[in-house]
Amino acid sequence: DHAILAEESGNQDGNDYRWIIDPLDGTTNYLHGFPQFSVSIALKYKGRLEHGLVYDPLREEMFTASRGSGAQLNDRKIRVSARKGLEGALLGTGFPYRDQRQLDAYLGMFKSLVKDTAGIRRPGSAALDLAYVAAGRHDAFWEMGLQVWDVAAGALLVQEAGGLVSDFSGGSNYLTGGEIVAGNPKCFKAVLQVTKPLL
């Protein structure tokens, strides 16, 4: 038996297998003709992420990962970047537009991180941002106000590409807690040092 949890159709109960699907991550971008959106699909088996796929239809880039088998971009193995810290790092993020109560905390994080890095990008698809971390395009990523379908596939991609993933306090509640930090091991730890005290 398979269950489906999808942004567009809600939750369907089932047994051991649970598909987590976002058929269009970056809906606002798509509606405005901004070319940054993706399809995100993850499969959990008995509560554990086993497979993830993020597809960028405009660039024909398919990021895939299976637990224990690494991460790939169009069948080519990918790894997180080797950057040793925030100096010169390129970060990805997203703004908490759904819940303005988080805005002050987020702006504090942004202010702390922007001065130490080469730049911060906000493209608008959390799934693609996480895929970019896995491929070494972003050195780290952080965002709040997210849903499980925004991050499930991307989180597995990052882990299988040698990166680390957590919630803002360093815990494991990143799938359902609404917040995520991801990156190569060094940049992940540096971003986490900023997010922890500002919560």
Task: Describe the predicted segments one by one.
Residues 132-135, 155-160:
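Hydrophobic residues within well-ordered alpha-helices
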Residues 3, 9, 162-179, 184:
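Acidic, metal-binding active-site segment of PIN/NYN-like and related structure-specific nucleases
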Residues 27, 56, 158:
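Conserved G/P- and acidic residue-centered "switch" motifs that form tight phosphate/ATP-binding loops
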Residues 139-148:
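Active-site neighborhoods of divalent-metal-dependent phosphate/nucleic-acid chemistry enzymes
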Residues 1-46, 53:
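Flexible, acidic active-site loops/lids enriched in D/E/S/T/G that coordinate Mg2+ and/or position polar
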Residues 135-140, 163-164:
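Alpha-to-beta junction loops
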Residues 42-130, 177-199:
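Acidic beta-strand-loop-alpha-helix segment within the catalytic core
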Residues 13-17, 86, 134-137, 175-177:
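A short, glycine/Asx- and small/polar-enriched loop/turn
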